[in-house]
């Protein structure tokens, strides 16, 4: 009996559970079923004499054989801290967070979880599925998608940790800056297709591409957000009653609305709608239909959304390939990346914004470039348009191409550069050369809603060419151009054949003559009005005193050297006639002369020339202005004397009338009350009209 109990005890303590299935003979074999039942009943009882049976361990698996998601699960959870709310969507709120271990900024998307008993279990199941999907999405990495970092549960909510993008979404940028120019749309579309191609190759549909789900950083790099797990978030939020379709139907493909089954081509439709949103600033169909009406219209119509008319032919063709009604007719993201709208092949043959060259004055006329200008018609180009810069030792501009400009500076600021004007040295002033400017004027339709900072034109022609009016021998300039050409100046003779022309519809010389004449005419009118205002008695007296004081003595009429030195002549700058002529000559020269350097150098060169040539050049102008001033002075003197005579007559009549009134008042007043009579006479004198 004692041996039997000992054998049973040894079987219970030392026998492994795997040995019961071997069918071995002996005591263990005979009592295998009994011992197993006895051991299980003892373990379930409250006695707790025997320990729990040992469960065999699984065979060890090397770390290299683990799948990627299993290896990722070994990473420690992120310790984070929630900050301020930075966004609120249809299915949750987004907060800014920080990784307290590394200091990295995070975006935390908070999704509510149902807490009532009826849907609690279903909500927990959705939460587990969402966590598993986020663990899979953590392995995705691309420059144009937002990285998933993990999940964290809280009471009543699930937090999804995402990469933080500081710039904001495309929809927020549209609200701040308005619709984008086509160059920006092209750059964003290319990055959008690259990120979408990566997702499609990994078998992930986005399902909700729109401007609000495309984030932009401070360097213009876009990142797709809310992909993959968005469907699970919608299902989880639907259970809590937070589901909303506001804003979403405008980007939905027809097959998604009809629920006939959709694939990756539904994302391509949404890409086309997003391009229309960037080009117009508003979603497609939003001007015609509300959300519910848009759902019905998109599901039943056979037409695509309206394409903006201001887009180029390449962009319109790109949109037609995205917005095909039949899903199988839409191009894939990989094919669309080869489209000319994305590759910008149509712009490689010509400069993007402006062209230029480097050259010396000798060979500058042999080079050309075309830059078409769009200017308001009443703003005619003049010499001042070149900012009065007229040296020609080196002309410097730059050529900007799209591939060189992307990512380096904002495309909206390329036009704001000093390279657009020709810079020349002051020491190389040209006698005998002219700068002629005119503009190719366009109709108002050509520059409607044109912003040179945001919508740079691609074809601005500008031609620097040798003027056909000038020859190498000599340049015959008219008097109205106010340019004095010395006959014996060897300093700048090698530059006589150089000129700049900006051709227009009519002749450049005619344009220049008309412009100069109009400026001189306007200036003369203005000065004539100023002269009339200055013709006062004080001015006449001052002018007469100057004439008397400036009369030379008879001794100095024969020889200039015999003029006495003690005569008090007024300074030349104080003489009205000379001051006016100096103003007029300066203004006329400023209308055609390129820079202030012109005046100083012209005077220095005139000093070494023959005096007779200078007198011949200045004599017609002096005679003309002398006659004009004489006629105006006579007219002003006659009008002033006439006006003075009338004033004197009116004053005499008024005084005579007042004396008559006072005489009548004295004769009619009774001598009884002298004080009252005195008051009445004073009141009548104060108001003689009574």
Curated annotation (Swiss-Prot):
Changes after translation: Phosphorylated at Ser-575, Ser-669 and Ser-687 by CDKAs and CDKBs. The phosphorylation occurs before metaphase and inhibits the interaction with NACK1 preventing the transition to cytokinesis.
Region named Disordered: 551-577, 666-690
Catalysed reactions, semicolon-separated: L-seryl-[protein] + ATP = O-phospho-L-seryl-[protein] + ADP + H(+); L-threonyl-[protein] + ATP = O-phospho-L-threonyl-[protein] + ADP + H(+)
Keyword Kinase among UniProt keywords: yes
Top-rank lineage group of the source organism: Eukaryota
Annotated catalytic residues: 208 (proton acceptor)
Domain Protein kinase as annotated: residue spans: 80-342
Gene Ontology CC: one annotated term: phragmoplast
Enzyme kind, highest EC tier: transferase
Molecular-function GO terms, alphabetical: ATP binding; MAP kinase kinase kinase activity; protein kinase activity; protein serine kinase activity
Bias (Polar residues): 551-568
Keywords in alphabetical order: ATP-binding, Cell cycle, Cell division, Cytoplasm, Cytoskeleton, Kinase, Nucleotide-binding, Nucleus, Phosphoprotein, Plant defense, Serine/threonine-protein kinase, Transferase
Principal cellular location given in the protein's record: cytoplasm
Pfam families registered for this protein in UniProt: Pkinase
EC code: 2.7.11.25
Binding site for ATP: 86-94, 109
Function: Functions in the NACK-PQR (NPK1-NQK1/MEK1-NRK1) MAP kinase signaling pathway, which is essential for somatic cell cytokinesis, especially for the cell-plate formation and its expansion, and depends on NACK1 and NACK2 kinesin-related proteins. Functions in the regulation of resistance gene-mediated resistance responses such as the N-mediated resistance to tobamovirus (TMV) and the Rx-mediated hypersensitive response (HR) to potato virus X (PVX).
Family indicated by similarity: Belongs to the protein kinase superfamily. STE Ser/Thr protein kinase family. MAP kinase kinase kinase subfamily.
Subunit structure of this chain's protein: Interacts (via C-terminus) with NACK1 (via C-terminus).
Protein name: Mitogen-activated protein kinase kinase kinase NPK1
